[in-house]
Each structure stands twice: as structure tokens, then as C-alpha cells.
């Protein structure tokens, strides 16, 4: 007889570990049962990736409201971005949705997939801009529909992961906003599961600006295809490294920022060895993507940081 399994148990069993599930017909766990962190077998493994967001000011497509066009000599499109990843020793490329051509087709995605394969690059994921805390109605439906559309795009690209946002508690209590977010995550997570795509909710301010709130949502969502997209630069608490450590066991993707800013303190360079130790201690296995957001020229700085990350891995 089949019994309910937690989403972590489900994923664990899919990875070949000895999970407690007898089948996958009862994926939804009881809300009273806290979900455990991912229990990965084997040793920590890191696959170097680069987020297209790192070159946000230079994409020909995207940011269509930008006041000034990028320098023609330094413009880049998604194909050239994949080439950059290949030329700088990356395993993967995170193709942020903002920088795709307007009204692109499935044929465009297939050409990009083919190009990446021939350059020896995996599409490690994509990232969307969404708000899951809108009240029920047309605008909320548009948000979930957009995420589902990108789930379809990710499947076609062969991308295993999409970064999603939670949202803010605008005009409502934080608890009400969390409930709305959880409902949207479960709806989209169910759909993502039919396509074999993970959704990683990012610690991106709003109702998930602190680790405990993010983990409350993660533990409540009843989908084995939902995890944390851990952005190492997005906690601005008194001890952001502690917050990273709390969330690392739930991570399905990690985005490394070269700067961090604790509460009440100026920005400072991230302690890469310390972050690597946290990830290794949590037995993280997966993509480790540079998302360069600092003020210096990414064309100069990104290669330097990719080299440092590779050495730390």
C-alpha cells in the first residue's frame, strides 16, 4: 500500500538513496509534518555556472526600458553569452529570461539549445521575475501563467531549474502574503513536476528577506519540485553567513555574489572560502553560478571571479 512521502523523501529516492517512500502516488505530505532538508548521498559536488544577469547592461535584448543602449562594441546576445561561458571554462550557463528577444519562438530555444550543446555547455537554468503574493484575481493568474510558460521553455531548453521570487506583503500581513505565495508555489510546482523542472525560490527581499521566513514557506509547500535558490548576497541581517548555512541544505541552485552587506554595515567582499565550507558542510551538490552584481566592469571582473570560484571548488 502506498503511503504519503515528503518532497525531500521523493527527491532523495529519485537520486537512488534509501528513501521511505513506497511510491509516488501520494506526493502531498501532511501539513503537520515538517519537511527535512535534502539528504544527498555521496560527497559535495559543484558545477561552475554563470548567470546572464552578470552582463545585464550589455545584452542587445532585454531591459527594453533602458535609457541608453549598450556600447555596440560590447553588446552581447544569448548565443554570445553561451560562447563566453564556454571560453571561460564554465560547465553551465544560466540564461536569465530578461535577456531573450521579444516574442521569441520555440525554434529560437532549440537553436540556443543546439548551440550550447555544441559548445559543451549545459543550460543550468533560467530565472524569471514574478510576484506570488498578489491577491487572487487576473493579475495573480497572469503571474502563475507566466511562470508556467517559462517552465515549458525550460523543458524545451533542457534546463533543470528556474529561479522564482516570492513577493512582498504590500497591503496585507506577512502571514497572508506567505499563504498566497505557498498556494502559487504549489500550483506552479505541480506543473513543474510534470515537466521535470525544479523551481527555486530565491531569498530576494520581501517576505523572504530572512532565512526563517523562507524556510517556513519551503517546509510548508507540498511539492517535491520546490527548493531554495540560494543567493549568497541577498541576506542583509546581522549574520548573513548564518542565514546561508540555514538555507544551504534546502538549496537546488546557488548563486554566488562577490559582495555581501550585513545589517548596518557597508558592502564588503564575500568570504568565498567560508561560503564554500558552508556548502560543503551541507553536502550541496549542483550548480554554483556566479551572478556578478558589483560596480566594476564585468568583462574584466567575471573571468577573475570564475577562476577564484573554480579554485575554491
PLM regions: where:
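Short loop/turn motifs enriched for small/polar and acidic residues
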Residues: 53, 167, 231
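Short acidic/histidine-rich active-site segments
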Residues: 289-292
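Glycine-/small-residue-rich active-site loops that bind phosphorylated ligands and cofactors
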Residues: 100-101, 169, 206, 235, ...
Amino acid at each position: 500500500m502506498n503511503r504519503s512521502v515528503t518532497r525531500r523523501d521523493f527527491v532523495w529516492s529519485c537520486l537512488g538513496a534509501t528513501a521511505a517512500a513506497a511510491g509516488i502516488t501520494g506526493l502531498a505530505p501532511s501539513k503537520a509534518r515538517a519537511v527535512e532538508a535534502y539528504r544527498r548521498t555521496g560527497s559535495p559536488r559543484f558545477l561552475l555556472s554563470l548567470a546572464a544577469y552578470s552582463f545585464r547592461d550589455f545584452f542587445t535584448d532585454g531591459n527594453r526600458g533602458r535609457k541608453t543602449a549598450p556600447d555596440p562594441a560590447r553588446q552581447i546576445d544569448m548565443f554570445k553569452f553561451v560562447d563566453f561561458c564556454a571560453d571561460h571554462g564554465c560547465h553551465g550557463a544560466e540564461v536569465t529570461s530578461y535577456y531573450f528577444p521579444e516574442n521569441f519562438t520555440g525554434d529560437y530555444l532549440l537553436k540556443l539549445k543546439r548551440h550550447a550543446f555544441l559548445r559543451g555547455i549545459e543550460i543550468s537554468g533560467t530565472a524569471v521575475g514574478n510576484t506570488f503574493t498578489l491577491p487572487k484575481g487576473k493579475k495573480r493568474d497572469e503571474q502563475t501563467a507566466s511562470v508556467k510558460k517559462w517552465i515549458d521553455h525550460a523543458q524545451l531548453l533542457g534546463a533543470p531549474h528556474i529561479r522564482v521570487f516570492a513577493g512582498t506583503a504590500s497591503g496585507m500581513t506577512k502571514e497572508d502574503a506567505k499563504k498566497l505565495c505557498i498556494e502559487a508555489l504549489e500550483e506552479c510546482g505541480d506543473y513543474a513536476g510534470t515537466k521535470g523542472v525544479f523551481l527555486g525560490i530565491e531569498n530576494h527581499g520581501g517576505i523572504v528577506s530572512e532565512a526563517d521566513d523562507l524556510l517556513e514557506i519551503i517546509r510548508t509547500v507540498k511539492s517535491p519540485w520546490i527548493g531554495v535558490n540560494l543567493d549568497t548576497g541577498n541576506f542583509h541581517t546581522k549574520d548573513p553567513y548564518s542565514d546561508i548555512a540555514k538555507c544551504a541544505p534546502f538549496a537546488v541552485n546557488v548563486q554566488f555574489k562577490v559582495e555581501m552587506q550585513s545589517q548596518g554595515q557597508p558592502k564588503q567582499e564575500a568570504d568565498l572560502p567560508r561560503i564554500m565550507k558552508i556548502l560543503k558542510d551541507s553536502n550541496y551538490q549542483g550548480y554554483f553560478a556566479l551572478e556578478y552584481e558589483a560596480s566594476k566592469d564585468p568583462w574584466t571582473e567575471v573571468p577573475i571571479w570564475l577562476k577564484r570560484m573554480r579554485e575554491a571548488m
